[in-house]
Curated annotation (Swiss-Prot):
Gene: fucO
Residues that, per the record, bind NAD(+): 38, 70, 97-101, 139-143, 148-150, 161, 180-184, 276, 341
Full protein name: Lactaldehyde reductase
Source lineage: Bacteria, Pseudomonadati, Pseudomonadota, Gammaproteobacteria, Enterobacterales
Family: Belongs to the iron-containing alcohol dehydrogenase family.
Keyword Cell membrane: no
Transmembrane segments: none
NCBIfam families, alphabetized: lactal_redase, PRK10624.1
EC number: 1.1.1.77
Length: 382
């Protein structure tokens, strides 16, 4: 069986990596950027770390800062209009997953106008042309949207999130610069960090996993498990490790898919605007326990790289240890323990479960889930 890997054309790593942006732009002959971001990142000076360099280099830019968490179809349309009126010929995404996902949708629709209805891009998007060129600068250590071929948009009318998978949307250049991430508050570091861990664990056990992605995912789990506590506590070296770990996870899962944790998390964002990382973090250990018997020896590997001494453990003991290691990490970094703590209503669980069953990510889960299974999992996590 042939396995495909799609990655950035170029990626820069390390503190100060954003300094390479101006040379990348000049080398490619781009004329004017539309920066896609949010108002918070403008107000706190993060965007200026990029625009100051562009100004000094004489590079033209405009900005769309209307992105909101769990970006909606309305946001995409608004940003698309700004791009079309800006005279820009490339895009710069500055932010976490929401600005990057919005940027991908803008870039794809701009070059594939027959998909102006954003809903038509759901699933495996049948576009014909590559996106408008995107340079991606993540400001969180979590989503890895800068290296994935996926983006997620919220349909506010139908109260659902949908995933678009399109090789045409991957950014040409990514700048993985921990200097752009240092300003995250501890709670955001925790949520985005466990989001990255979820990507690595789900990618490791997903149905499409193979040798190369397994190597990426188990290394990502090791990096994230070793660095997240320190990063949340303010250790800058740990923060730089998280920047790398989340990217390595993205290299893997983008090419093989995810599973039921993401399938169940997406409806929470659509129904309640729950931060995606928080939803994943709460659900992850519960879904891991549900999947345990369908993962071979992989939970033993997970437990080992998370610091558990697995020598002499039975397979069942090692699987339980992996789940407990995730629960412990969640507790240590301050993740809310229950869905009810983040506003999920028990009476909504049947509708949430149906949406999760229909989510594109659920199909990659190693254990085939029924509607009843998902209802029970939501109740367990509630």
């Amino acid at each position: 069986m042939a396995n495909r890997m799609i990655l950035n054309e170029t990626a820069w790593f390390g503190r100060g990596a954003v300094g390479a942006l101006t040379d990348e732009v000049k080398r490619r002959g781009y004329q004017k950027a539309l920066i896609v971001t949010d108002k918070t990142l403008v107000q706190c000076g993060v965007v200026a770390k990029v625009t100051d360099k562009m100004d000094a280099a004489g590079l033209a830019w405009a900005i769309y800062d209307g992105v909101v968490p769990n970006p909606t179809i309305t946001v995409v349309k608004e940003g698309l209009g700004v791009f079309q009126n800006s005279g820009a010929d490339y895009l710069i995404a500055i932010g976490g997953g929401s600005p990057q996902d919005t940027c991908k949708a803008i870039g794809i629709i701009s070059n594939n106008p027959e998909f102006a209805d954003v809903r038509s891009l759901e699933g495996l998007s049948p576009t014909n042309k590559p996106s408008v060129p995107i340079l991606a600068i993540p400001t969180t250590a979590g989503t890895a949207a800068e290296v994935t071929i996926n983006y997620v948009i919220t349909d506010e009318e139908k109260r659902r999130k949908f995933v678009c998978v399109d090789p045409h949307d991957i950014p040409q250049v990514a700048f993985i610069d921990a200097d752009m991430m240092d300003g995250m508050p501890p709670a955001l570091k925790a949520a985005t960090g466990v989001d990255a861990l979820t990507h690595a664990i789900e990618g490791y056990i997903t149905r499409g996993a193979w040798a190369l992605t397994d190597a990426l995912h188990i290394k990502a789990i090791e990096i994230i498990a070793g660095a997240l506590r320190g990063s949340v506590a303010g250790d800058k070296d740990a923060g730089e490790e998280m920047a790398l770990g989340q990217y390595v996870a993205g290299m893997g899962f983008s090419n093989v898919g995810l599973g039921l944790v993401h399938g169940m998390a997406h409806p929470l964002g659509a129904f309640y605007n729950t931060p995606h990382g928080v939803a994943n973090a709460i659900l992850l250990p519960h879904v891991m326990r549900y999947n345990a018997d369908f993962t071979g020896e992989k939970y033993r590997d997970i437990a080992r790289v998370m610091g558990v001494k697995v020598e002499g453990m039975s397979l069942e003991e090692a699987r339980n240890a992996a789940v407990e290691a995730v629960f412990a990490l969640n507790r240590d970094v301050g993740i809310p323990p229950h869905l009810r703590d983040v506003g999920v209503r028990k009476e909504d669980i049947p509708a949430l479960a149906q949406a999760a069953l229909d989510d594109v990510c659920t199909g990659g889960n190693p254990r085939e889930a029924t509607l009843e299974d998902i209802v029970e999992l939501y109740h367990t996590a509630w």
